[in-house]
Amino acid sequence: MSIDDLKSKIPDFAKDVRLNLSSMASDETLTPQQKYGLFVACGIASRNADVRKALVAEAAGKVDASVIQAAKAAASIMGMNNVYYRFVHLASNKDYRTMPARLRMNVISNPGVDKVDFELWSLAVSAINGCGMCIDAHEDVLRKANVTAEAIQAAVRFASIIQSAAIALEAADTE
């Protein structure tokens, strides 16, 4: 399955989603590694099998397997961190902020790819998962690494498009 296959499954009520998928596929704001890593990480984070399969397949022929593995790791580790840190951020009891997380997250310091790319993928997945604390932390790391606001915005735009594709497919499944 490819992005074109995915677009063909998007119903007419979500025509904008199809158009956004097309623009995302041809976007050149990011490096190929950043772009296809986002496809994989956000496809997994969308929790939709069709979206995940299409985007992983799209990336498979365009980047090294290590990029795909690292993007999978970003989605996985953010699945854990986004839940934990969203709780810490939203809980009325601020004592949780001073407690050690006691969660293993070694992959963040040694992702096997450029750390900036891994941070970009982590930011996008954090946006999908709605963890404001994680969004702020990853955006700060990216800005300190001189990543442009346009690149950061592109990553979050990709995340929003990918998530909307998953929702459109779920909505179509109710017809």
Swiss-Prot record:
From the UniProt record, list the reaction(s) this protein catalyses.
N(6)-[(R)-dihydrolipoyl]-L-lysyl-[lipoyl-carrier protein] + a hydroperoxide = N(6)-[(R)-lipoyl]-L-lysyl-[lipoyl-carrier protein] + an alcohol + H2O
Q: What is its EC number?
A: 1.11.1.28
Q: Does the keyword Oxidoreductase apply?
A: yes
Q: Which Cys residues form disulphide pairs?
A: C131-C134
Which residues are responsible for catalysis?
C131, C134
Entry-linked Gene3D superfamilies? AhpD-like (1.20.1290.10)
* InterPro entries per record: AhpD, AhpD-like, AhpD_core, CMD-like
Is the Translocase keyword given for this protein?
A: no
Q: Name one GO molecular function term.
A: peroxiredoxin activity
Output one GO BP term: response to oxidative stress
* Keywords per UniProt: Antioxidant, Disulfide bond, Oxidoreductase, Peroxidase, Redox-active center
Similarity comment: Belongs to the AhpD family.
**Biological role stated in the UniProt entry:** Antioxidant protein with alkyl hydroperoxidase activity. Required for the reduction of the AhpC active site cysteine residues and for the regeneration of the AhpC enzyme activity.
Q: What is this protein called?
A: Alkyl hydroperoxide reductase AhpD
- Species this protein is from: Brucella suis (strain ATCC 23445 / NCTC 10510)
Q: Which gene encodes it?
A: ahpD
